[in-house]
Swiss-Prot record:
It comes from Erwinia billingiae (strain Eb661). NCBIfam families: PRK09874.1. This is Multidrug resistance protein MdtG. It is a multi-pass membrane protein. Belongs to the major facilitator superfamily. DHA1 family. MdtG (TC 2.A.1.2.20) subfamily. InterPro entries: MFS, MFS_dom, MFS_MdtG_subfamily, MFS_sugar_transport-like, MFS_trans_sf, Mutidrug-R_MdtG, Tet-R_TetA/multi-R_MdtG-like. The chain crosses the membrane at residues 17-37, 59-79, 92-112, 116-136, 147-167, 174-194, 222-242, 257-277, 291-311, 320-340, 379-399. Pfam families: MFS_1 (PF07690), Sugar_tr (PF00083).
Amino acid sequence: MATADVPLSSINWQKNLFVAWCGCFLTGIAFSLVMPFLPLYVELLGVTDPHSLNMWSGLVFSITFLFSAIASPFWGGLADRKGRKIMLLRSALGMSVVMVLMGLATSIWQFLALRAVLGLLGGFVPNANALIATQVPRNKSGWALGWLSTGAVSGALIGPLIGGLLADSFGLRPVFFITASVLFVCFIMTLFAVREEFVPVQKKDMLHAHQVFTTLKNPRLVLTLFVTTMIIQVATGSIAPILTLYVRDLAGDIQNLAFVSGLIASVPGVAALISAPRLGKLGDRIGPERILVAMLLVSVLLLIPMSMVQNPLQLGILRFLLGAADGALLPAVQTLLIYNASNQVAGRIFSYNQSFRDIGNVTGPLMGAAVSAHWGFRAVFVVTACVVLFNAIYSWITLRRRVDRSSMLDE
């Protein structure tokens, strides 16, 4: 069956990349605007017992990722049938409506249900990745996907700061309405600025899920990349629950603990913002597989000394360097995925990858909390380093066996 995508030359992929970057930036801001005060909003909805507050805060945070993991393959299949632009529009508008409803919620059960619906309707960033990956020339895909990844990262960095200021100035509920407005701007911008020439595929002509993997050049490698994506998120998420407490252990009872913890939490994102396009471009030249394995090993070498630091400054420096390495990982994975998948199934492959990413977002904090409860904060970094090391070794073995990269570039 002929691919549903038109030749690359008929589309201004540079313009689409810029607009998709802006969309990912706005989506990153929108999602992170409400994150700093989620527990406060749960409390506002009537959950006041400290134990219950912790439980509900964890539930409303994780349920979005759980439902996103479930829904992503469905939306990916629909994207391969109907096009990626319509999925961007569906995601932006759907999330905008849900954010309005969240601001109107009157009970914790309503809020929990809406967080689940948010996960079901989300997916702007993976669909943007699929759109750009299928339009950009293959020899520029590492740079393009690396640059695109900085949109969501930079939005997520700015969002909590703006969200905190807005919540202090206007209250908690208005921030949800402001977030909805940001997502609606993303919808309008995508509607009028993104161009995609896509020939819809009849449902009867669509490949079934098991057939998708038969079209891949190296199915085993793709499965390894899915697991790598999950472990990247596990490694990131495992540290999140204990970071503030670890900083307090290192610094003592300082007055500006929240500021110092927030700074240390955000520096990896700043480093990733700087490194992702550069390492993506380097990957286009020397191969994304080398970048992936090298940066996984660098991550291991940085995680281990984090368990030995004596003050917050040392931790901050190591986390900045870790962010620079991590900034190359997901773009390298995405580049390898598009090398191995045809445009015909790209939407589903990226959606499966998103499902594994969501699973990592859920399991990472659980692993970090469990390890710290049994062996202390420092053990979290050691255990995480071991998990990443296993993934680096397995990825290296799998990537060594894959076909020559030049044959992957031949379409």
